[in-house]
C-alpha cells in the first residue's frame, strides 16, 4: 500500500465526500469543545490546549491534509479491490455491524442502522473491504 500511495498522484478528490469529511471534522471538534471546554475558554485556546494548534487555520490545514490522505487511501483500496475482484457481501456488512454493535453496546446491526441511517452500510462495507484488501496485500507480500 505504501509503495502505491507514494507513487500515486491524485488529481481530484470526490467533492461531495471531501466536503462531508471536512464538515464532519469541524462539527466533531466543535461538539467536543462545547462539551469539554473550561469556563471562558475560547475555541482557539481549546484547540491549542488540547491539540497544539496555534490557530484555527492550522487546524483547518490539518483537516484538509487528513481528508486528502484518507480519500487517497480510500481510492487506492477501491482500485486494488476492483483489480483483484475483492468483494464485500451483505452478510459481511451485517457481521461487521454486529461486531460493532457488541463493541458499542447496541443490540445488533439493525440498531446501528436505525440510529445512524443506511449510510452505515457504506461505512461498514468500506471497513470490511479495507480489511480484505490489507489481508490480500499481506498475502501477496509474504509470497514474494
Annotate each language-model stretch with its function:
Residues 1-144:
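Extended, charged alpha-helical "arm"/coiled-coil substrate-binding scaffolds
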